[in-house]
Amino acid sequence: MRKIILASGSPRRKELLELAGVPFEIIVSEVEETIGAYSSPSDIVMSLALQKASAVAENNSDHIVLGADTIVTYESRILGKPSNEAEAKEMLQLLSGKTHEVYTGVAIIAKDKTVTFYERTEVTFWELTEEEIDAYVASKEPLDKAGSYGIQGKGSIFVQHIQGDYYSVVGLPISRLVRELKQFNIDVTHA
């Protein structure tokens, strides 16, 4: 049977696959995440997910490789992972009291087929005080997350409303992924 390989070192994606009962191994993709000239946020995340999966699939062509990428957008501005605490603070100030979009793209590659898709989720933040932002940034949690917050962690207290797939905001739209894996004859719902 073909193995499923997750081309990501994200502990959140690993946890979501485990929770869903998807058997997998991890081989971290070494692809540099650079955003070129794309027409839309959905194109960006699907392209980056495909680049990550393709890099790992080159040496694992007999298996199924999953790649994923997540970005946050606000008013056409792309908010990736912050490069430092000052940038994290700036992003949180920007998102305070507003609705933003989270896009997660997924690529599934096998020898005979490639599937890419994305999910878009709207997230609305409460108005945040400077003290809340400073304390959160000091916790270091936002420093490795797109948009500078983790909805599954301390950042959850900032969320007033969500419209769409919660797990996509965490980093992997697991329900959709499980359905897409059926195209590759993998059905974890009966495992």
Swiss-Prot record:
Coiled coil regions in record: none
CDD domains from the UniProt entry: Maf
Keyword Hydrolase among record annotations: yes
GO cellular component: cytoplasm
Catalysed reactions listed for this entry: dTTP + H2O = dTMP + diphosphate + H(+); UTP + H2O = UMP + diphosphate + H(+)
Protein name: dTTP/UTP pyrophosphatase
Keyword Phosphoprotein in annotation: no
Location(s), subcellular: Cytoplasm
Gene expressing this chain: maf
Transmembrane segments: none
Native organism taxonomy: Bacteria, Bacillati, Bacillota, Bacilli, Bacillales
